[in-house]
């Protein structure tokens, strides 16, 4: 066991865990942040996606000890009080969820995409989201939701504010 220190969703956490434990295990089992889902356990499906220093990463294959000094954002860290993050709201508006299992990973990947590319083409969206699998087949709605946020950024001039 080791004492691990984290910055998650803007808050400091200390956890006693095996350094080889995955970030996903720390989030779900030690910190009760269950919005991040376990899918495949191999980094292939995207259900466990979180942001580490603003980049989409698979938490099921990320060792907790490797991210101690980095900024981690989970799905729980996106909304501000009762106000959903623009990507969360767009997913809701466009019906880009069914069973909901992949939704948090999809949203986290979409946030990472829009933070680095404020106006992605449909092809860029499809390419970036390729690592996120949806068993229910909501891909066209996911693309529409991401395009909606990108288009609203153009209208409102909030491109730099999408991550928060």
Where are these predicted regions, by residue range?
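Signature of N-terminal electron-transfer/Fe-S-associated modules in redox systems
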Residues: 1-164
